[in-house]
Amino acid sequence: MVAKRLGFRRDEALTLGRAVASLNAYSKGVSLGLFRPSPKSLKERRKKLMRGRRLKVDVLRRAVPVTRTPDGLRALSGGRPISPASVQRYLQDKFGDCLAPARAAMRGLARSAPPKTLAASGYTLYVKFRPSVAAGVKGWGARGKLDLNLIRRLTKTSRSRNS
């Protein structure tokens, strides 16, 4: 929702959101000792192997690698464009019947602040409503409950601050 509010088309926003989620998950995995960052030389070799022009887009204070495709910008994962359809399937699988209400609540929150404010404070908002899971490795990959009423309350608070 943040990328859409910042002016990206729906398909572009889906891939950017997925990339941000993956980058955040990877960072948490590194902090828990589950992953080791790849050596700089390996990263440089990977960059040289990637075809097409790469750009970076700032979403929620994350530099997301993207490329232009005939269908618009696509965030990259493993050097390849993320498919918006695969993101949609993933969301449908994870949220099921709750996807539409969750999307509506998040859309309301995204619209409650001007784009510049949202770009600067979107991650802080997310931290306030993200589902809680067990701390440390126990919580890695665990499912939490998304509190839509909390998101709606944050929307009201944000609207009153930004009006």
PLM features per residue range, with description:
Residues M1-S163:
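Solvent-exposed interaction surfaces and binding hotspots enriched for charged
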